[in-house]
């Protein structure tokens, strides 16, 4: 076959490329065995590697879990007395839980990862074996105290096939579903709400309901209703989720919604588990350019029944309106207007007595306003942060207007900037606490130290007026801090990809180190052959900006050999994706064991750097930072002769699937082979919120310019496309349209269609085919004939990405 070839359970067939003889020893069965064993090889060998601490309510005590030889221990620390001890008698608890559950347990093999202290710390609760358990620490008795929460999963499934609970998590990266961040925030769900819902007024006298698409009130406990509106209809209805009473119960605001287009994606599940015949299903799924719901705020005066429709001059073309939020003194309510195209974001305040609206804050970037919340999450964050101080008389707001993500203090009465709080060539990553009394902000930031990794997270405190900037963490690494409830103490856990975690207890007042809690011990890991990734930087396309990445080599690395290179790509603009914190298991390592050097870096267009760095993605997702990536590769090759950039492969999932195929289409002179899983190959086919955020609205030629479908004819190298049949994140048709375009262009390619799989299409078969594809096309070695071999070990997952 010289067209699209469906892969089910057979090895890949293709022309063998010419490969230097020095590499012929790579890609052997022994290499596969090492790759398959990588998941479990280092399990339990990292000692004292802590990840997080948990403060106990409003106390000065906290607990954490740490790995030790033979298992794990729970540790309890009192910050006042500096006493550190086991959180409980592990052997006694294991005996009690064994007796109650019928499971054989030891003190170091307790199956739960998390505990909650209850009953004044005289007992602990945890979830295990499908139930919630309570264990008394006085007599070490355990009993079931309830069912496990719905969807709770105490440990990963036996294989890496995504489950219903975790099918949007692949290789530690969270994929956002089409419903998250979509166009409404409760108020614009597009459907009239059932009459049974009611919203009580703060004074307890009234209940607001929706009946026949209109707003009604009734005395609490009564059935007789009073109509506040009569202009609602099936095509222009009021929504219950938007109802907001003023705190003094004199006013009520609700949104009247004109529904947009209800697009659906259709699925045919070919091989359902519960029946022989296929199943058809649909899913609501808005796409770029679709007509959206349009919300109209309406204010009602309860005493007079007066209705005021708010003039929409300040919000004429909404992508979304946030639900109304009242000032505590009922003088006004606010909502946030996100204009279609994301080039105008506005905080609007409305006087309920007059219905007059005014703009308090305007964000009008030339490119896009990243409207998702400022989270502190390396891989998923936006810019939007708002904190209303003193009932909105001041507002703390995040903006990139000076070219970097910083905090500003607004006068909530005049709408004018009082002062910029943070400033400099670095970015605020999250706000942890706002202390109105002391007028201080506790926040996370990165990039403040020239020459250091600009993605490392550090913690700071600053005054509202921008003075008193104080660093609470200073050690070179990425930090994760948890504060006691009174902000008197903090636990600082920090690491790097090449440095095991260090956990310290410090005092906020003077940052004094009170107790070194743990220091990761890697001696056993090192004896077993573990090696950390190498951090590598190179200058990007502008000749001045550093591009940061990591290099992963096989554990049997031989510098006298030539190694083909495989790039793990995810270039979604919602975050940055090269690992910064320590991890024992790096799934890129398994792929490297086959005889490759595997790398990952963040090119321009990703987040957590300057606005200019981020803006490269605007209307240009096809760029994916490739100019920077290729320069980075060339810099590595210039330093290391064994780094063979004549044989570069690339793989990715979701937006990484789009980019990996895009690398083949737009840079065929550099990338020779790609595996693209669950790709959103044409941004007109994918979910509206993610794609319009970066590609803009209205749709234009720039969408086609970035489309892998429209550019499929450019394919020169070897491409494996993976499509999950039941992908609820990316429309499976996105991949199939690429296949169609490749067939029409008479381009050879490979296709794996995975029945029943959701986003990421995980599982050993998918991973093994990725291995085989690169072994075949980059090493020039024929993979094993798996049909004739026993299925010895499940491969580690090798997909990555986010969206």
Language-model region placement:
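Bacterial N-terminal signal peptides
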Residues: 9-20
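Beta-propeller folds
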Residues: 23-501, 505-506, 523, 527-530, ...
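Generic structural signal for short, solvent-exposed loop/turn connectors between secondary structure elements
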Residues: 20, 42-49, 129-131, 209-212, ...
């Amino acid at each position: 076959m010289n067209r699209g070839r469906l892969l089910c359970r057979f090895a890949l067939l293709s022309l063998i490329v010419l490969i230097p003889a020095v590499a012929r020893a790579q890609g052997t069965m022994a290499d596969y065995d090492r790759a398959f064993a990588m998941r479990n090889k280092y399990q339990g060998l990292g000692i004292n590697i802590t990840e997080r601490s948990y403060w106990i309510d409003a106390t000065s005590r906290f607990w954490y879990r740490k790995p030790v030889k033979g298992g794990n221990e729970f540790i309890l620390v009192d910050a006042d007395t500096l006493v550190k001890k086991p959180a409980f008698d592990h052997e006694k608890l294991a005996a009690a839980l064994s007796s109650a559950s019928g499971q054989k347990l030891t003190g170091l093999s307790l199956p739960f990862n998390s505990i909650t202290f209850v009953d004044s710390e005289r007992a602990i609760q945890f979830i295990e074996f499908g139930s919630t358990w309570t264990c008394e620490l006085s007599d070490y008795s355990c009993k079931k105290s309830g069912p496990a929460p719905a969807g709770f999963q105490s440990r990963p499934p036996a294989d890496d096939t995504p489950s219903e609970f975790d099918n949007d998590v692949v290789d530690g990266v969270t994929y956002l579903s089409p419903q998250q961040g979509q166009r409404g925030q409760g108020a614009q769900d597009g459907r009239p709400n059932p009459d049974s819902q009611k919203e009580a007024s703060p004074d307890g006298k009234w209940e607001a309901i929706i009946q026949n698409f209109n707003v009604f009130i009734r005395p609490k406990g009564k059935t007789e209703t009073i109509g506040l509106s009569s202009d609602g209809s099936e095509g222009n209805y009021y929504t219950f989720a938007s109802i907001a009473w003023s705190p003094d119960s004199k006013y009520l605001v609700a949104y009247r919604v004109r529904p947009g287009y209800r697009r659906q994606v259709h699925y045919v599940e070919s091989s359902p588990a519960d029946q022989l015949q296929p199943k058809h299903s649909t899913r609501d799924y808005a796409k770029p350019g679709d007509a959206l719901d349009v919300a109209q705020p309406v204010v009602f005066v309860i005493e007079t029944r007066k209705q005021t429709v708010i003039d929409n001059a300040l919000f004429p073309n909404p992508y979304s309106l946030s639900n109304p939020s009242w000032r505590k003194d009922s003088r006004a309510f606010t909502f946030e207007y996100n204009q279609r195209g994301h080039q105008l974001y506005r905080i609007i305040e409305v006087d309920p007595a007059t219905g007059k609206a005014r703009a308090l804050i305007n964000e009008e970037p030339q490119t896009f306003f990243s409207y998702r919340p400022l989270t502190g999450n390396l891989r998923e964050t936006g810019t939007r942060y708002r904190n209303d101080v003193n009932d909105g008389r001041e507002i703390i707001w995040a903006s990139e207007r000076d070219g970097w993500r910083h905090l500003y203090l607004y006068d909530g009465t005049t709408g004018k900037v009082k002062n910029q709080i943070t400033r400099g060539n670095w970015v605020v990553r999250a706000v942890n606490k706002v202390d109105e009394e002391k007028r201080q902000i506790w926040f996370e930031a990165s990039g403040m130290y020239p020459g250091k990794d600009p993605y490392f997270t550090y913690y700071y405190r600053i005054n509202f007026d921008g003075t008193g900037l104080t660093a609470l963490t200073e050690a070179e690494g990425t930090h994760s801090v948890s504060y006691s409830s009174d902000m008197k103490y903090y636990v600082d856990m920090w690491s790097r990809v090449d440095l095991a975690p260090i956990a310290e207890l410090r005092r906020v007042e003077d940052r004094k180190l009170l107790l070194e809690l743990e220091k990761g011990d890697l001696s056993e890991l090192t004896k077993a052959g573990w090696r950390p990734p190498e951090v590598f930087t190179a200058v990007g396309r502008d000749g001045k900006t550093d591009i940061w990445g990591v290099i992963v080599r096989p554990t049997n690395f031989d510098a006298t050999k030539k190694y083909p290179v495989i790039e793990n790509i995810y270039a979604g603009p919602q975050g940055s994706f090269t690992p910064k914190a320590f991890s024992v298991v790096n799934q890129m390592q398994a792929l490297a064991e086959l005889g490759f050097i595997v790398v990952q870096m963040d090119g321009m267009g990703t987040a957590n750097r300057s606005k200019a760095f981020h803006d490269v993605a605007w209307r240009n997702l096809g760029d994916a930072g490739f100019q920077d990536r290729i320069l980075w590769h060339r810099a590595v090759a210039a330093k290391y002769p064994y780094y063979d950039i004549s044989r570069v492969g690339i793989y990715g999932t979701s937006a990484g699937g789009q980019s990996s195929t895009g690398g083949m289409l737009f840079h065929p002179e550099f990338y020779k082979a790609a595996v693209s899983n669950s790709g959103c190959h044409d941004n007109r086919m994918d979910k509206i919120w993610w794609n319009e955020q970066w590609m803009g609205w209205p749709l234009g030629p720039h969408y086609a310019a970035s489309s892998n479908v429209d550019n499929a004819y450019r394919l020169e190298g070897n491409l494996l496309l993976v499509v999950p049949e039941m992908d609820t994140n990316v429309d499976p048709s996105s991949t199939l349209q690429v296949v169609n375009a490749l067939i029409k262009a008479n381009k050879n390619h490979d296709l794996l269609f995975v029945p029943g799989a959701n986003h990421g299409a995980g599982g050993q078969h998918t991973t093994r085919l990725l291995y085989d594809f690169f072994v075949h096309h980059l090493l020039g070695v024929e993979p094993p004939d798996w049909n004739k071999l026993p299925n010895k070990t499940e491969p580690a997952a090798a997909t990555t990405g986010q969206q």
